[in-house]
Curated annotation (Swiss-Prot):
Beta subunit of the heteropentameric ligand-gated chloride channel gated by gamma-aminobutyric acid (GABA), a major inhibitory neurotransmitter in the brain. GABA-gated chloride channels, also named GABA(A) receptors (GABAAR), consist of five subunits arranged around a central pore and contain GABA active binding site(s) located at the alpha and beta subunit interface(s). When activated by GABA, GABAARs selectively allow the flow of chloride anions across the cell membrane down their electrochemical gradient. Keywords: Cell membrane, Chloride, Chloride channel, Disulfide bond, Glycoprotein, Ion channel, Ion transport, Ligand-gated ion channel, Membrane, Postsynaptic cell membrane, Receptor, Signal, Synapse, Transmembrane, Transmembrane helix, Transport. Potentiated by histamine. Its main location: membrane. This is Gamma-aminobutyric acid receptor subunit beta-1. It comes from Mus musculus. The gene is Gabrb1.
Amino acid sequence: MWTVQNRESLGLLSFPVMVAMVCCAHSSNEPSNMSYVKETVDRLLKGYDIRLRPDFGGPPVDVGMRIDVASIDMVSEVNMDYTLTMYFQQSWKDKRLSYSGIPLNLTLDNRVADQLWVPDTYFLNDKKSFVHGVTVKNRMIRLHPDGTVLYGLRITTTAACMMDLRRYPLDEQNCTLEIESYGYTTDDIEFYWNGGEGAVTGVNKIELPQFSIVDYKMVSKKVEFTTGAYPRLSLSFRLKRNIGYFILQTYMPSTLITILSWVSFWINYDASAARVALGITTVLTMTTISTHLRETLPKIPYVKAIDIYLMGCFVFVFLALLEYAFVNYIFFGKGPQKKGASKQDQSANEKNRLEMNKVQVDAHGNILLSTLEIRNETSGSEVLTGVSDPKATMYSYDSASIQYRKPLSSREGFGRGLDRHGVPGKGRIRRRASQLKVKIPDLTDVNSIDKWSRMFFPITFSLFNVVYWLYYVH
């Protein structure tokens, strides 16, 4: 029993030992050990001249490009640029770096890249770029046995993107990344997208706050300069702006403020303070929205789509304020002459009101009338020459002081006394009617202006919105 258990334990212990012995033997015979790799790398770098391109004097070097887009951090309309973070990989074949005896790829320290020839690639529309350096410089160099070199970088670049903002914010923009050789012409180097359509990855995973990436396109071409023809690769992003932010921040507030300005049509026309305050407030609010929007956009010479909408809202708000100015002009007077005449009438009325309380009595107790008072009590062609009833009680008054809202009882008694003695009262009634006709405006016209405005403004503003959105959306 013990012997069987001992043998089983021995067998279990001997298996790992045998595996370790096999592994050690294999490791000792493995050519890819540290010393052999070190010798291989030293041999490759010994006598290597980074000043000369691969196959110098022969055919051009084919450099393949691959891009893995990590993020598009910002798209700025003010600066006309966008910021892109990517993993940028270049690959080419350098026969001077081929090796044998090691069936493995050699991934070396990033500092080895400073000892090897690399393409003089640059971004044509670059404004500011940098290679990330945390915690070490984000570079990769990998050698293949056939001499293929893979060179990778993690780069953040801010590239120029010229935008057409005529349809802003209902626009689509094309932002490109131009990759070109700075010094080598097509006689020395050629660029191509390594992997065809799969050369660019990660685009579908990108999410932007104000844009959606509709499509992207890769282009390979040659450009001619005075110094020769140079290879160029272009990666173009088609960005469609999301309208949701602008509806909440610009379109909806502007629409509500325009509708708010129409409230004045339902306010009584003699409430000047309320209607003027409402009109001025809405005008200033629209001005503030327009000013804030201009600060977030470049100073461009053409009119944008959002400018047209804001100007339309501003016109409707301003016309609502002018509508009350027109109503006020009709209701309270037709020009400065009317205002001057009303002031003179007011001062004359005050003077005559004071004189109405004065009564002149002769020695017999009769009330006397002055020449002006006699003229005021007669019609155009009829002249009062005397008073038939010396006991009649008369008060001096002026026709200019007739108040149609608060008639004096003493004047009515005096009028009846004159009518009783044969002095006609129809002329006086006609004078009062003519004065009432001049002083009281036609309230029906004022009400009709507000009434028609309540229908005209909403209908025209709705038509403006229909035309605007149909034109710019489709």
